[in-house]
Amino acid sequence: MQGVLTCWDGRRIILPDVVRWKFQYGCGTPCDSFQLTCLWEPGEADVLAEAVSFTAAQDGETVFTGVVDECERGWDSSGGTLTVAGRGMAARLLDNEALGADYQVATLEDILRDHVAPYGIEVLRQAALPPVPNFSVRTGSSEWQVLYEFCRYYGGLTPRFDRLGRLVLAPWEEGRRLVLGADTAVTALTLRDQRYGVLSQVLVR
C-alpha cells in the first residue's frame, strides 16, 4: 500500500512504511472514508499541517482519493507513527453550504457550475438529465443536497464518486459478480447493528 498526501501548493508527501489501513466505500451519506497508519519520524511533522488531500494506491491501482480531516502523531517505545484520516471527495460538497437560489429553469450544467465546479471536483461522465422548471435551492442546504435532489428526484439517478475522486452522474455499469462460497478463505467476519444515522427524511415545501 502506498499513501501520498498533497499540500495546498501542490507538493507531495509520500508516506513511508504503511502498517495499517482501512477504507470504507459507500454511496451518498455518509461518504467514503479512510484511515491509514504509517511509521513517522518526529522531525517530519511540520509539513503535515499543509496537507489537504490523500491518495492511496495498491499494485499501481488507485484505491482511494479524498480530503484530509485529521493527522495524529504518536510515539512509544517502538518509535513514531502517523495516522491520517479523512473522507472521500464528496466531503467538499457535504461541508459547504449552498446559497439560496431560485432557478426559472435549472439544467445540469447550471447545477455543476454553481454547486460543484467551485470546489475543484472533476466530473467523469454525466447522463443527459432533463431541465427542471422552478427549481429552488433552500438556504442552509449543503451543496451535496442540491446535487443529490436535482439528480435523484428529477433525473432518477444517484450521484457518486469513483476511487479517483471523480464525480459520476450516470447509471451503474454492469460489473463483475463475486461469490463468497465454501471454498473462499474468509479470515474475518463482522456483523454490525447500526442504530444511528439518517433512517428516513421527509421534505415539505
Language model features with spans:
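Structural motif
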Residues: 8-9, 58-59, 180
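Amphipathic, non-transmembrane alpha-helical segments in extracytoplasmic/periplasmic proteins
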Residues: 35-36, 86, 97-123, 138-163, ...
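Surface-exposed cap/loop segments at beta↔alpha junctions
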Residues: 41-123
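Surface-exposed aromatic
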Residues: 128-137
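Acidic, small/polar-enriched beta strand-loop surface segments
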Residues: 1-4, 148, 171-205
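Juxtamembrane "anchor/assembly" segments of surface/extracellular structural proteins
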Residues: 1-47, 87-91
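Extended amphipathic alpha-helical segments with heptad-repeat/coiled-coil character used for oligomerization
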Residues: 157-178
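Envelope-exposed proteins and targeting segments
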Residues: 32, 64, 80-82, 163-165, ...
